[in-house]
Each structure stands twice: as structure tokens, then as C-alpha cells.
Amino acid sequence: MIRKIINALWVLLAVALIAIVVVFVSISKGWIGYMPPVEELENPNYKFATEVFSEDGKVLGTFSMEKNNRVYSSYADLSPNIIHALIATEDVRFAEHSGIDAKALFRAIVKRGLLLQKSAGGGSTISQQLAKQLFTEKVASNTMQRLLQKPIEWVIAVKLERYYTKEEILTMYLNKFDFLNNAVGIKTAASTYFGCEPKDLKIEQAAMLVGMCQNPSRYNPVSRNPKIRENALGRRN
């Protein structure tokens, strides 16, 4: 009897593993859900505003057909403070994984899924968050799509890691993120909130902006709601 139970468990495990492999292969091939083609992965579509300069080189304003004021910042234009804060907060093993942090994912499943701990932290890497920003943010319109969205993000994250360096992924993430208050991208956010360039962000300023990455509305430092401003300060500290 015990042997039959053990054999049945092995069969169930084998079937589950095969099903997982089939799902991920199907996602990678684009048979299930939306998988961006190589051309789109190599050239993601996110528009930047055009900066208008005066004769003496000062920025007078920005212009964009997309109705946002995102202005590009290269990796060299970013303060080490914003890079270190982002990695420490969102993806401490960013330099070690290839898109998926198995350890963080397992921890999140056990603590959140099994132990129901809200403060267990997430399992999403910076690469996964970028995948969501670029390709899957508006896809989950029904239950099936929501169930598939996370595996799709995993596959896209792994592909992004193949096509881009770690520095390029960080740069794309910070340029893409919407920091609210018409501050799309790190350059506009640094100017809007602190009146400086991204390369000049101090530790506490970088911590404040990175704190918004988890939930911009909840950690909005200039919100009219004092509770939200308090949340932003607590998150920063």
C-alpha cells in the first residue's frame, strides 16, 4: 500500500514537471500568451521627450507626442546612490541571477503563499519588473491572462538578460518607471522632486525615489495625504 502511494506521488511529480516544461516552452514560443519577437525585445518601444535648449545651453522645456516628459539618462549619468539603492531594495542578488532569483521566489512562495506573511518580500527581480513595464503591464485583463502573466514575465526577463547587460537593464528600468506627478523616468523625477540631475542625487534622495518603485501612489512624497507622505518617509528610512 505504501509503495503504491509512493509510486503515485512520483507519477504526479513527473506529470507536474512535464506540465511546467510544456507551459514554459509554449510561452517561449508564443503559443500561450503574448511573447514579443526578438526585434521588439532588442528595441523596446518607449518614447522620450525632446528637450528644447536656449542659446546658452539651458533646458527651456520638453516636447513629446506621447504626452509625457521622459528624458533619457545613460548609465553614466546615474548616481551610484540610485543604483545601489535600487539593487539593495528591489533585487539584492541582481548581479548573480539570469533574470529569475530562485531563492527569493521560493522564499516568497513559502512565506506569502503558505505562511501568509505580508512582510515576506517579493520574488520579482529588476529584470522581471522591467519585463512587466515593457510588455505585460496592460495584458492581464482576464483570469487566465493573470494566471499566465507571471510565467510570461519570467520568460521575458530571462530573454532580456540575454540581450542586455546588467547596466543596460538598470538604465532601462529607471528610464521607464513612472514616478507620478508628471515625472516619467529618473531624469525628470530627479528634477521634479529634488531640482537636480540623476548624477547628483544624494543617498536620502535616491532612497526616496527607489522607495516609490514598489508602489508610487502609496509612497508619494508630495501627496496631499499626510499618511501617504509619512509612508514615503518611512519607506525611505
Q: Could you tell me what each predicted segment is?
A:
Residues 1-52, 113:
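N-terminal type II signal-anchor transmembrane helix
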